[in-house]
């Protein structure tokens, strides 16, 4: 369940602004910063690997399996959403060995069937945005973290998956499985509406 607490804002230098006044939001992604529980991880996930945007040692690192060839670096979770509803999906992502990342949906039969958008984690810029996503944003925080967000609208199929992926370049989905391809992630969120509100930690249902 979501933790109910006042939303706190920080600037790029991680200095406290104060309590935010913003719409109430529910984070629909359970275990939203514990990517080892209920998430499909491709590769090796190390929990509590790095300092997260909130200053705690709670950010995760995902690195490829080292199996050779090409494949994915991914944390993906199954979701059940409402039909014909607009959602904002967001996550905090930081470059590690990989300097690109993308957020994607899949397994929906209509609406955002398989749709992705890419960001450059070195320059803080938006790359390719596929049909199904809108209002894509990347906001720089302290210590090279970015909050990345985008908006989707569901169709009649409400069951699908949302994933955070590492990438080697814009508009590419596969990485070299050499044991070094990695990104840092924290604070995934899915909420109704058109705005990424302050991150709400979640745990069990």
Task: Indicate where each model-derived feature is located.
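Glycine- and acidic residue-enriched flexible segments with recurrent GG/GxG motifs
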Residues: 1-205
């Amino acid at each position: 369940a979501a933790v109910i607490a006042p939303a706190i804002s920080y600037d790029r230098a991680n200095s406290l602004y104060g309590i935010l006044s913003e719409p109430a939001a529910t984070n629909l992604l359970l275990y939203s910063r514990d990517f080892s529980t209920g998430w499909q991880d491709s590769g090796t996930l190390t929990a509590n690997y790095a300092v997260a945007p909130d200053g705690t040692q709670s950010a995760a690192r995902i690195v490829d399996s080292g199996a050779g060839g090409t494949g994915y670096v991914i944390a993906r979770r199954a979701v059940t959403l409402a039909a014909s509803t607009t959602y904002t999906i967001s996550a905090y992502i930081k470059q590690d060995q990989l300097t690109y990342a993308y957020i994607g949906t899949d397994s929906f039969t209509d609406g955002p069937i398989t749709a992705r958008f890419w960001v450059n984690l070195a320059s803080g810029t938006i790359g390719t945005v596929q049909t199904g996503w809108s209002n894509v944003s990347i906001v720089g925080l302290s210590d090279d973290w970015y909050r990345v967000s985008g908006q989707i609208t569901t169709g009649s199929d409400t069951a699908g998956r949302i994933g955070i992926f590492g990438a080697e370049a814009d508009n590419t989905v596969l990485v070299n499985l050499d044991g070094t391809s990695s990104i840092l992630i924290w604070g995934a969120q899915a909420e109704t509406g058109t705005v990424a509100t302050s991150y709400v930690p979640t745990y069990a249902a």
